[in-house]
């Protein structure tokens, strides 16, 4: 067995274990939070998608046949998988109008990667798509950077909001937020370069796996530390933001209503 096969097999087992841990931890949650549970299943789906990708790589010998083919398959699966994990985090951090915006942008970037791959295949007439691979890499990097920036912004806003609204200890939440952002930054810095070279993938792959395991354990810890008070804060915050969003769409909300009342008077 060569090193590449062992790495891919280890990644396959690792992703399945992480997915099972997330599913089994559902049994130990004291208080259910709908947004957290939604995020849990999104991340579980992402881990199973990654596991399927490693299984396909092993069965088909895709990475072994060429770094470019391995990179193409990686980007076709990594992009939606990473988007699901990022949205799982973002779903906990922000409110409905902003979540919708992230879904649209992530979908557009994923579609751009798949279209680029299809155009490259038609243009070259083979699976070796040449310089179109770097166009795919550009869209992949843009997707990762976008997810990191959006999550970072929402974490800062939510931290300030919770400090104003909550008198209880929010250290578990802050710990989860920091770890999630660090892991996303790690993926943003490492993966676009690692997937182009099998040697780099073998060196950096175990580091990314350890980071993902830490993320999984921290995410599970967040779920077990949820209390009803935090759920109420989430609902109240979402209600306030949704109300402001509706007022903005109605043309200024309270200020327009004040102007109308003075006009009528």
Spell out what each predicted region is.
Residues 2-14, 114-153, 193-205:
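Extracellular-loop-to-transmembrane junctions of the mid-late helices
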Residues 8-28, 38-63, 75-83, 108-118, ...:
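Hydrophobic alpha-helical transmembrane segments of multi-pass membrane proteins
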Residues 18-25, 81, 143-159:
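Membrane-water interface of transmembrane alpha-helices
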Residues 27-42, 65-67, 90-103, 126-129, ...:
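Membrane-interface helix-boundary motifs at transmembrane edges
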Residues 73-84, 139, 207-210:
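Membrane-embedded alpha-helical segments of multi-pass membrane proteins
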Residues 90-120, 131-140, 165-183:
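The cytoplasmic-loop to transmembrane-helix boundary for the fourth helix
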Residues 169, 175-237:
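Interfacial "cap-and-anchor" motif at the non-cytosolic start of specific transmembrane alpha-helices
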Residues 218-265:
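Membrane-proximal linker segments that couple transmembrane helices to downstream signaling/catalytic modules
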């Amino acid at each position: 067995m060569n090193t590449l096969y062992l790495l891919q097999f280890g990644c396959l087992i690792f992703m399945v274990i992480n997915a099972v841990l997330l599913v089994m931890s559902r049994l130990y949650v004291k208080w259910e939070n709908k947004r957290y549970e939604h995020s849990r299943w999104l991340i579980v789906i992402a881990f199973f998608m990654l596991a399927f990708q490693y299984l396909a790589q092993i069965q088909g010998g895709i990475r072994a046949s060429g770094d470019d083919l391995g990179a193409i398959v990686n980007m076709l699966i990594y992009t939606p998988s990473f988007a699901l994990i990022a949205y799982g985090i973002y779903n906990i951090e922000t409110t409905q109008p902003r979540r919708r915006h992230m879904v649209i942008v992530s979908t557009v970037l994923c579609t751009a990667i798949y279209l680029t791959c299809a155009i490259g295949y038609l243009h070259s007439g083979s699976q070796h798509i040449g310089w179109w691979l770097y166009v795919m890499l550009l869209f992949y990097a843009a997707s990762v950077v976008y997810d990191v920036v959006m999550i970072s912004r929402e974490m800062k806003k939510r931290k300030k909001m919770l400090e104003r609204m909550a008198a209880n200890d929010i250290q578990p939440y802050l710990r989860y937020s920091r770890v999630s952002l660090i892991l996303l930054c790690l993926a943003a810095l490492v993966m676009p370069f690692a997937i182009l070279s099998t040697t780099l993938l073998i060196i950096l792959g175990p580091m990314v796996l350890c980071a993902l395991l830490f993320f999984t354990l921290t995410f599970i810890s967040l779920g077990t530390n949820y209390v009803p008070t935090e759920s109420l804060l989430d609902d109240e915050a979402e209600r306030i933001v949704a109300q402001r969003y509706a007022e903005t769409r109605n043309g200024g909300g309270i200020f327009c209503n004040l102007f109308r009342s003075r006009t009528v008077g």
